[in-house]
A protein has these predicted regions:
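Periplasm/extracytoplasmic soluble domains of Gram-negative envelope assemblies
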Residues: 85-88, 96, 128
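Acidic, low-complexity mobile loops and tails
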Residues: 20-79, 116-151
Length: 151
């Protein structure tokens, strides 16, 4: 009897605005993505910024998140903190310019929440200084293609 190979589960699948990259990392439609693997979720003139599922998978078990302070101001491409895992440390690069209006304090005691749900556990919320900067970021499809080239 000839065996037919089974494709990997969910490879390239799309459901309810969520797609899965070849690395099995989740990518969400409607968000903006940077080449340094941060995402931006915009709500009016404010935005949530965190690391992508691809980033948390690459880092492994996250043990510490160095977050900015409320009222800190960042330009796009400025470092705003760092994420440390058992495998590596990675600088966080702000994909947008703005003023920090909130940080996710839960990550101080439970940095591993990012491993459980990277998109649900943002790092900082900013008041955007220049929404036109979003045009230089990737949409979900472009980010998937970017991750596929990196992998």
């Amino acid at each position: 009897m000839k065996r037919i190979p089974t494709p990997p589960p969910l490879a390239g699948a799309r459901a309810a605005g969520v797609s899965i990259t070849k690395t099995m990392a989740k990518v969400i439609e409607g968000l903006y993505y940077s080449e340094s693997h941060e995402y931006v979720k915009v709500e009016g003139d404010e935005a949530y910024v965190g690391i992508t599922d691809y980033a948390q998978e690459s880092l492994g078990n996250i043990v510490y998140v160095d977050m900015p302070e409320v009222d800190d101001e960042f330009a796009a491409e400025d470092d705003f903190g760092a994420v440390e895992s058992v495998k590596a440390a990675s600088d966080l690069v702000s994909p947008v310019s703005g003023t920090v209006i909130e940080v996710n304090e839960a990550l101080e005691d439970q940095p591993e929440l990012i491993n459980q749900d990277a998109f649900g556990n943002w790092i900082m919320k900013v008041k955007l200084s220049d929404k036109s900067e979003l045009d230089s970021l990737m949409d979900a499809k472009a980010y998937e293609e970017f991750c596929a080239k990196e992998h």
